Structure formats: structure tokens, C-alpha cells
């Protein structure tokens, strides 16, 4: 198998891994509910936490991050030493992210990408991920609004990625693409924030 074919296979596998809807799976098996029918209807950690408590929300967050981390690490291992290793590793990361947003298993209706994006940043730009996580904690702690923390943390992650990797790195531009998609997926949250109607978390 050529390096290019292997890279494309890994990209496809990354998408399928990213498509695994852990929020829906845990919601059904642990809570006996479809999380798409409760709260905000989102399949991510925040809505699962609202429906089933903080511990279940954290479990979904970790699993949603892991479904990006694992494919990226596998791609790095299998593509090590090949000419397009960095490019295909970044494409695997993007594929896992797109899989979470548009999962084939759920009719292409997925989550908002924050936890999966965090998993990607943790592997590709760890210091940027750390800065983003701290920013999320501060912003969320100050407002108790998850979307404020998510958007703030994402912005810092992207800035940190460009600082760490420069303007010519595929990692930096992949980070910018992730951030743009996260903002798009949060457009309703942004509208509610502008109107002062975004809900605060109580878990």
C-alpha cells in the first residue's frame, strides 16, 4: 500500500471514529433517554451534563476528545518518516472533527465540536490546548455559561497555535478551520448571548 493510499484510509477511519456519538450512546445506556430529545438537543458533554449530571458529562467530554486523539496518534505512528506525514495527520484530525459535527451514524447531525477540538489541539499543539483550557475555565467560572467558555477557549487555542507553529504550518490553518466551524456551530448560542438569553449551567 502506498503512503498516499494509507493516508486516505486513515482519513476515512478518522471520520468514522469522529462520528461515534458517545453522548447519544451513554445517554441511552446510562440514562435511558435520547439526549437529542432533552435540553438543548445537542449530543455533546454540556447537554449530557444537564440531563445526567457532571460525571456523565465529563465522561462524554473525555470520550469525544479521545475519538480524535486516537486516530491522530495512530496516523502519526503509521505515517512516521513518510513525505506527507504532517499533512495526512492534520487531515485525519480534521476528518475526526468533521465526523463529530456531521456523523454518518446520526444522519449527519452532530455536536458542536468543542471536546473533539480540544482532543485535536492536545495532540497537535499541547501548549495552545492548555492555554485554551485555562481560558475556558476562567470564562466559564466567571459566567457559568458554557458557550462563553467554549468560544473564549477556542479563540485562545487558535492564537496559541499560530504563535507556536507559525503562519505557514498546516497545524495552524487546521486550528483556524476548527475554530471557524465551532463558531458556526455556536451561532444560535451567540444569538442568545447577544439577546441575554443564554442559559447558565447549574451542574
UniProtKB/Swiss-Prot annotation:
GO terms for biological process: phospholipid biosynthetic process. The keyword Transcription does not apply. Coiled coil: none annotated. Pfam families: G3P_acyltransf. It comes from the Bacteria. The chain crosses the membrane at residues 5-25, 55-75, 88-108, 114-134, 162-182. One of its GO terms (cellular component) is plasma membrane. InterPro entries: G3P_acylTferase_PlsY. Probably interacts with PlsX. One of its GO terms (molecular function) is acyl-phosphate glycerol-3-phosphate acyltransferase activity. Keywords: Cell inner membrane, Cell membrane, Lipid biosynthesis, Lipid metabolism, Membrane, Phospholipid biosynthesis, Phospholipid metabolism, Transferase, Transmembrane, Transmembrane helix. Pathway: Lipid metabolism; phospholipid metabolism. Catalyzes the transfer of an acyl group from acyl-phosphate (acyl-PO(4)) to glycerol-3-phosphate (G3P) to form lysophosphatidic acid (LPA). This enzyme utilizes acyl-phosphate as fatty acyl donor, but not acyl-CoA or acyl-ACP. It catalyses: an acyl phosphate + sn-glycerol 3-phosphate = a 1-acyl-sn-glycero-3-phosphate + phosphate. This is Glycerol-3-phosphate acyltransferase.
Amino acid at each position: 500500500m502506498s503512503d498516499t493510499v494509507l493516508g486516505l484510509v486513515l482519513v476515512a477511519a478518522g471520520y468514522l471514529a469522529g462520528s461515534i456519538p458517545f453522548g447519544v450512546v451513554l445517554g441511552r445506556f446510562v440514562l435511558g433517554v435520547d439526549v437529542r430529545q432533552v435540553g438543548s438537543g445537542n449530543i455533546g458533554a454540556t447537554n449530557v451534563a444537564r440531563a445526567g449530571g457532571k460525571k456523565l458529562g465529563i465522561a462524554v467530554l473525555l470520550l469525544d476528545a479521545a475519538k480524535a486523539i486516537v486516530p491522530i496518534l495512530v496516523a502519526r505512528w503509521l505515517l512516521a518518516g513518510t513525505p506527507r506525514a504532517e499533512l495526512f495527520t492534520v487531515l485525519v484530525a480534521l476528518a475526526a472533527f468533521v465526523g463529530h459535527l456531521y456523523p454518518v451514524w446520526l444522519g449527519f447531525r452532530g455536536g458542536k465540536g468543542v471536546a473533539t477540538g480540544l482532543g485535536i489541539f492536545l495532540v497537535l499543539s499541547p501548549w495552545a490546548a492548555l492555554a485554551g483550557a485555562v481560558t475556558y475555565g476562567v470564562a466559564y467560572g466567571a459566567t457559568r455559561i458554557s458557550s462563553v467558555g467554549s468560544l473564549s477557549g477556542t479563540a485562545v487555542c487558535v492564537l496559541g497555535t499560530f504563535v507556536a507553529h507559525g503562519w505557514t504550518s498546516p497545524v495552524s490553518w487546521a486550528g483556524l478551520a476548527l475554530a471557524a466551524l465551532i463558531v458556526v456551530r455556536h451561532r444560535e448560542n451567540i444569538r442568545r448571548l447577544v439577546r441575554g438569553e443564554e442559559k447558565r449551567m447549574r451542574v
